[in-house]
């Protein structure tokens, strides 16, 4: 037949135009088709046959095909068939004019599957009708709907069905879904041919018997046993061959109807027109003795198909010549047609098995026999225990053994029981259960029989055995497709398919397969479901993406930290995140700002938010928190204080952002996503952090940032964060350290990839402040007591910029550089500890620090930013201009809190200072803060400096002014530290209270200050001194206060920092040391002053001397009463209590006095600046190693040339000589601001004077009081440094500091040229160093810079 039908190739070409191209592709290209068991006929033949019979089947009158049929059907029989085709009364194919839609509507069974296209391929599987032949996946399903004779010259594209199926078979699983649909359809199709639509649409309980039990895989479609075919009453579905042998009924047995007809067709017509349609919406079979027992069908077509059982109508005839097969269900016909076409849409679902079958039943048989030993299809007839591997065999069994009436109806399938149970039980259980249920349902068989079980479960849960077959790893998409060729519920998705994985658990599924076969299918499906459930459940527990608990703080917590606060491994990052926050941090993780991980990592993290365990990163890593915005979603984590409260674990987004930013900067990675409010947060959050209760937090405030962007060990005795007790030990997962965890040294966090801020000198409170401050600073390592503090300037600046300032900055919304904000925050905390307003007042000094930083940075920008901060932070605080220098006492108290402020200052270190390398300032912030307090006068100095027009300092105008004042203090004796402060240990800074008072006194003596400033202006300050423009804006009182305040703040022991016993001891030690140094210097002071005055920098020397005299006079004033011209423990310990006025007067009068003022800061011997100091990075590491290197500011200044170097805490070793061991910022720079504009930093850079005998380079020959106020206190928030430093281990290397200031601190404030201009000092510290080693006094330059910047800042703040 095939040979006869084989059309010439031309036919294929002509008949099969591009539409068939796909089909051709499938058929022609898939050699598997033949191999798969296609008819020996070539594809084209088969196709033609399919099309021909298809055409016949679809439309008897091939009118629509006629035009094409001649060409299309190469075989002569094609037209013959068309003409011969007998129109079935009800058959949708009966009328050629009927399109698929019509057929679907008219023939309940025939095309329902097509309509629903549950089995898109099933529709294709119909062979000639292959609506879905081309699997829906191929997109032909709809196209194939054109199978209707009208579909085109092709009639229905048999090729399509064949193609799709063949394609499926040939390609194996590629067409799986179509196949599964096909397979469902096929399984259904044969029985469907009898009751096709009825079985499909209805659950075909009765009709389902007809329907294929076919493979369990064909979930919804094939097997009534499976419940899919509940509606399929036809056992004949068995392979489509076993439709019930209907009696050729011609008499109507409808209730109350006894009509008789001559032909079956008439009977069918009668039933359809009189009874079924008469039933209207009630689709109940009233046929006498109907097993449905009046149970209604869901749809009319189901009833129509059902009635075929009674009438024996088989409208669906095989169109192939010589084949007389007819089926009551179209789907059965389609399945049958596959035998002619060789189409095998049902592919074995077992992995690795490519066998394809024309019907689902065969596939189920194959799968169950070959790939498993299961016999899921159990005969449910009571007393029968037969089991079969496939539904067709079961149907055969039932039909032959139990009789044609023993339809595999619901009673046989045991749908009710099986449905509920099979999904839950293993296939074996299902089998047993299926049997039991079969029995149970057998008892209820009558009702069950008529009952439509398919749609409920079969469609849902019952995949075809193939679809769900245990052997198949997956249901073929087709299998999963609910193809009820029978037309039952085709849309229902079989629960068993993987696509239905979600449904598997829920699906009692296989139970609905009411037959033993169905139960067998259920077993298989249950196996599959079990597997799937395991997969599902396992995934739910294992495979499912689960977010591991992120809250663990432990090592796992590290992972969770990554996950949660990802960027921040709690333990490893200095930042600790609460365990709970980890989970919350999943949300925050989205924020890449905080994460230490790269954004890429963050991305993975985000994707892996599920994966709570992210690689742990050491908190010590500077950039650990780079990616995450905020590790903790916890509001507390976000809240500055809350974050701080929890310790680092609660880093705020800003803090985390900074950490990440630093990390990114360090790693060169992209900057973290800025927080929406990050910039303000920089100041605000930091400030909040600094101001938060964490002031006492374990984090030693700002880690010093080195220009090298690396954490450098302070020379000797420096404690690395990891080295700090518990600092390195704590893992990211470890609980966040509380403020009390002072011992825990935070690892240095890179901020902005600039430099690691080393927590060096900052007080532990500073650390806590830093921690409280959060931000990247919060990540800064906490050095228990860094032997080597960061540069004084850094500390000073940090102190200067206190949380209060930061807060004000936040409040005022100033846009400040991150550095500025950080410093301000740091300082603000210190100032908060001391007096927020003082800080504000001190703000200019902060700016001075900033100026130092600016000196370091060579930017007045920072000063301006600081000014902004100051304005923001302090303008509100009070006396931004005035700086409440008289509040220096408060400042002193404040400096008690200054350590906290230092800590805060340390926190700000992370900001842009990294780039400038001024991060050292944060460490020095306490000193700087002291300077701030002294800086109020310093601000006055700035104001005076503002009067100075030195263009060079214009950038750093405020800082220059500051620096000028400070330089006036520092230049002579000490190298100008970055902050223009000699960074003295916090203890030294404790003495700044008296200078603060002096500042107030300075404020009281504006004229003197003015005079001094005037001299200062005349003195060759660095161009920063020239930047006196700010000074004009700076309140002279501020400048005065600044001058006094600096010394006060530096000197006031109690106020600056919280007086912890250790800190007190340190302060006392420092004070004693400073006093002793000062005493030495006072002893040497006269000649030092003489040297200073006489030595190079004559201009400055004279000016300084004059200033010193003036300053002495000024300091002699009540303002300066606290300053003692001669060093005395009292002076150092309580500068205010010192007879500083007289001493200052003396100092003013004599260079010695000036050099020796409390303002004068002891400096390390004036040896040549160590290279390490010259290079802040290396020197910072070595700072502790050598006095010169001791000054963290040395390195920091190196890192940021503009940075005001803060002298490290003065240690007794510094006492070697006044010149070498101590730098006194006697500062010619007395800022007597009779008027802000007039104030000129008289602080002569006179290295001679500054040297105070060349040894006391740090001293300004200007009034010792003033210098005490400015240089000592303002230049060095030494308290922090002292706090940070281990006083016992720390050697104060003022020379190093000054040297550092020389290069970095002096950058613009006191240019080496200016110092060089001083005959005495070839370098800034030359005077100092001339005594020990001539070194230009960078401190003076920085001081000038600071003063200038302070003046500018004050001006700015005033404008604010």
Swiss-Prot record:
Gene3D superfamilies: Classic Zinc Finger. Residues 474-496, 1173-1190 have a biased composition (Polar residues). GO terms for molecular function: chromatin binding; DNA-binding transcription factor activity, RNA polymerase II-specific; RNA polymerase II cis-regulatory region sequence-specific DNA binding; sequence-specific DNA binding; zinc ion binding. It is found in: Cytoplasm; Nucleus. GO terms for biological process: cell differentiation; positive regulation of DNA-templated transcription; positive regulation of transcription by RNA polymerase II; regulation of transcription by RNA polymerase II; smoothened signaling pathway. SUPFAM superfamilies: beta-beta-alpha zinc fingers. Residues 230-245 have a biased composition (Basic and acidic residues). GO terms for cellular component: cytoplasm; nucleus. A zinc finger (C2H2-type) spans 250-275, 316-340, 346-371, 377-402. Residues 298-306, 360-365, 390-396 are annotated as: Interaction with DNA. Residues 198-245, 390-434, 457-500, 718-740, 1120-1213 are annotated as: Disordered. It comes from the Eukaryota. It holds the Pfam family zf-C2H2_15. Transmembrane segments: none annotated. Residues 461-473, 1134-1143 have a biased composition (Low complexity). Keywords: Activator, Cytoplasm, Developmental protein, Differentiation, DNA-binding, Metal-binding, Nucleus, Repeat, Transcription, Transcription regulation, Zinc, Zinc-finger. Belongs to the GLI C2H2-type zinc-finger protein family. Acts as a transcriptional activator. Binds to the DNA consensus sequence 5'-GACCACCCA-3'. May regulate the transcription of specific genes during normal development. Mediates SHH signaling. Plays a role in cell proliferation and differentiation via its role in SHH signaling. This is Zinc finger protein GLI1. It comes from Xenopus laevis (African clawed frog). The gene is gli1.
């Amino acid at each position: 037949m095939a040979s006869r039908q084989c059309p010439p190739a031309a036919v294929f070409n002509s008949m099969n135009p591009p539409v068939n191209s796909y089909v051709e592709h499938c058929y022609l290209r898939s050699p598997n088709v033949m191999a798969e068991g296609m008819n020996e006929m070539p594809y084209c033949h088969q196709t033609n046959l399919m099309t021909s019979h298809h055409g016949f089947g679809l439309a008897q009158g091939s009118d629509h095909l006629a035009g094409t049929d001649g060409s299309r059907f190469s075989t002569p029989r094609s037209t013959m068939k068309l003409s011969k085709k007998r129109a079935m009364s009800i058959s949708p194919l009966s009328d050629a004019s009927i399109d698929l839609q019509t057929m679907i509507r008219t023939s309940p069974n025939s095309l329902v599957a097509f309509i629903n296209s549950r089995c898109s391929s099933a529709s294709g599987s119909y062979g000639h009708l292959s609506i879905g032949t081309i699997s829906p996946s191929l997109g032909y399903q709809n196209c194939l709907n054109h199978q209707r004779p009208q579909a085109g010259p092709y009639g229905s594209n048999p090729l399509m069905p064949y193609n799709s199926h063949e394609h499926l078979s040939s390609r194996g699983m590629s067409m799986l879904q179509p196949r599964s649909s096909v397979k469902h359809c096929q399984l259904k199709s044969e029985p469907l041919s009898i009751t096709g639509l009825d079985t499909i649409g209805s659950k075909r309980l009765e009709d389902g018997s007809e329907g294929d039990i076919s493979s369990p895989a064909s979930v919804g479609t094939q097997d009534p046993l499976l419940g899919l075919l509940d509606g399929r009453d036809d056992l004949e579905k068995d392979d489509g061959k076993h439709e019930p042998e209907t009696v050729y009924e011609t008499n109507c047995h409808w209730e109350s109807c006894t009509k008789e007809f001559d032909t079956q067709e008439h009977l069918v017509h009668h039933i359809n027109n009189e009874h079924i349609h008469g039933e209207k919406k009630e689709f109940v079979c009233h046929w006498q003795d109907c097993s449905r027992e009046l149970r209604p069908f869901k749809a009319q077509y189901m009833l129509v198909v059902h009635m075929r059982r009674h009438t024996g109508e088989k409208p669906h005839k095989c169109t192939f010549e010589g084949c007389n097969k007819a089926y009551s269900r179209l789907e059965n016909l389609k399945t049958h047609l596959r035998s002619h076409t060789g189409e095998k849409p049902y592919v074995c679902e077992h992995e690795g098995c490519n066998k394809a079958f024309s019907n689902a039943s065969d596939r189920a048989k194959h799968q169950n026999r070959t790939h498993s030993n299961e016999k899921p299809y159990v005969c449910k007839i009571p007393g029968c225990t037969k089991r079969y591997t496939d539904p067709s065999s079961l149907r055969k069994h039932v039909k032959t053994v139990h009789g044609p009436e023993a339809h595999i109806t619901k009673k046989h399938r045991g749908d009710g029981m099986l449905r509920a149970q099979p999904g839950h039980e293993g296939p074996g259980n299902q089998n047993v259960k299926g049997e039991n249920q079969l029995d149970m349902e057998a008892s209820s068989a009558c009702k069950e029989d008529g009952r439509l079980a398919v749609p409920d479960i079969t469609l849902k849960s019952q995949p075809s055995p193939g679809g769900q077959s245990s052997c198949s790893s997956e249901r073929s998409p087709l299998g999963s497709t609910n193809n009820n060729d029978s037309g039952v519920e085709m849309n229902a998705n079989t629960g068993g398919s993987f696509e239905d994985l979600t449904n598997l658990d829920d699906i009692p599924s296989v139970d609905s397969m009411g037959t033993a076969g169905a139960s067998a299918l259920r077993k298989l499906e249950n196996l599959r479901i079990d597997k799937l459930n395991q997969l599902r459940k396992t995934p739910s527990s294992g495979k499912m993406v689960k977010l591991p608990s992120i809250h663990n703080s432990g090592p796992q917590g590290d992972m969770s930290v990554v996950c949660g606060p990802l960027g921040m491994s709690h333990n490893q990052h200095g930042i600790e995140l609460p365990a709970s926050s980890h989970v919350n941090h999943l949300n925050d993780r989205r924020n890449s700002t905080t994460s230490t991980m790269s954004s890429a990592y963050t991305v993975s993290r985000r994707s892996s938010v599920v994966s709570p365990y992210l690689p742990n990163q050491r908190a010590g890593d500077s950039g650990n928190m780079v990616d995450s915005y905020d590790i903790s979603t916890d509001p507390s984590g976000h809240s500055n204080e809350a974050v701080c409260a929890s310790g680092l674990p609660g880093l705020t987004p800003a803090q985390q952002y900074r950490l990440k930013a630093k990390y990114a900067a360090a790693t060169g990675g992209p900057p973290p996503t800025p927080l929406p409010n990050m910039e303000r947060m920089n100041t605000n959050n930091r400030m909040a952090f600094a101001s938060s209760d964490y002031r006492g937090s374990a984090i030693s405030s700002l880690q010093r940032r080195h220009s090298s962007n690396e954490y450098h060990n302070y020379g000797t005795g420096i404690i690395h964060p990891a080295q700090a007790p518990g600092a390195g030990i704590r893992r990211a997962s470890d609980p966040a350290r509380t403020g009390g965890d002072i011992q825990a040294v935070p690892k240095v966090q890179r901020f902005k990839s600039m430099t690691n801020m080393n927590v060096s000198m900052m007080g532990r409170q500073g650390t806590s402040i830093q921690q409280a401050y959060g931000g990247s600073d919060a990540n800064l390592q906490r050095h228990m007591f860094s032997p080597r503090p960061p540069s004084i300037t850094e500390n000073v600046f940090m102190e200067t910029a206190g949380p209060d300032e930061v807060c004000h900055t936040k409040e005022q919304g100033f846009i400040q550089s991150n550095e500025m904000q950080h410093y301000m925050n740091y300082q603000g905390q210190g100032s908060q500890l001391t007096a927020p307003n003082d800080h504000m007042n001190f703000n200019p000094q902060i700016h001075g620090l900033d100026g130092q930083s600016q000196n370091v940075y060579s930017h007045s920008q920072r000063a301006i930013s600081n000014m902004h901060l100051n304005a923001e932070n302090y303008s509100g605080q009070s006396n931004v201009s005035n700086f409440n220098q008289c509040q220096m006492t408060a400042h002193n108290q404040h400096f008690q809190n200054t350590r906290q402020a230092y800590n805060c200052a340390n926190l700000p270190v992370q900001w842009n200072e990294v780039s400038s390398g001024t991060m050292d300032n944060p460490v020095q912030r306490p000193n700087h803060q002291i300077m701030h307090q002294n800086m109020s006068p310093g601000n006055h100095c700035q104001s005076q400096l503002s009067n100075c027009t030195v263009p060079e300092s214009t950038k750093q105008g405020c800082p220059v002014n500051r620096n000028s004042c400070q330089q006036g203090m520092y230049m002579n004796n000490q190298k100008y530290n970055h902050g223009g402060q000699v960074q003295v240990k916090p203890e030294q800074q404790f003495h700044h209270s008296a200078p603060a008072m002096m500042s107030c006194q300075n404020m009281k003596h504006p004229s003197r200050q003015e005079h001094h400033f005037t001299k200062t202006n005349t003195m060759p300050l660095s161009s920063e001194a020239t930047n006196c423009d700010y000074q004009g804006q700076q309140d002279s009182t501020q400048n005065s206060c600044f001058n006094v305040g600096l010394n006060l703040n530096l000197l006031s022991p109690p106020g600056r920092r919280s007086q912890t016993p250790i800190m007190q001891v340190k302060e006392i030690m420092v004070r004693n040391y400073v006093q002793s140094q000062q005493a030495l210097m006072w002893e040497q002071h006269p000649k030092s002053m003489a040297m200073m005055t006489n030595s190079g920098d004559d201009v400055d020397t004279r000016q300084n001397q004059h200033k010193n005299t003036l300053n002495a006079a000024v300091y002699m004033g009540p303002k300066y009463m606290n300053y003692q011209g001669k060093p005395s423990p009292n002076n150092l310990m309580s500068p205010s209590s010192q007879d500083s006025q007289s001493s200052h007067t003396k100092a003013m009068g004599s260079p010695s006095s000036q050099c020796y003022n409390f303002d004068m800061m002891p400096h390390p011997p004036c040896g040549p600046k160590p290279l390490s100091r010259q290079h802040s990075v290396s020197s910072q590491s070595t700072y502790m190693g050598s006095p010169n290197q001791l000054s963290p500011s040395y390195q920091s200044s190196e890192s940021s040339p503009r940075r005001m170097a803060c002298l490290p805490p003065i240690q007794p070793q510094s006492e070697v000589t006044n010149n070498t061991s101590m730098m006194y910022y006697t500062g010619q720079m007395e800022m007597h601001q009779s008027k802000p504009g007039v104030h000129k930093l008289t602080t002569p850079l006179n290295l001679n004077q500054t040297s105070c005998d060349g040894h006391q380079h740090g001293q300004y020959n200007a009034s010792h009081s003033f210098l005490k106020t400015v240089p000592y206190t303002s230049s060095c928030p030494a308290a922090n440094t002292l706090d940070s430093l281990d006083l016992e281990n720390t050697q104060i290397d003022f020379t190093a500091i000054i040297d550092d200031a020389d290069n970095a601190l002096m950058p613009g404030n006191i240019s080496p040229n200016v110092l060089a201009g001083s005959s005495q000092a070839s370098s800034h510290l030359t005077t100092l160093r001339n005594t020990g080693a001539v070194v230009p006094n960078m401190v003076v330059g920085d001081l000038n810079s600071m003063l200038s910047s302070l003046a500018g800042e004050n001006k700015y703040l005033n404008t604010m």
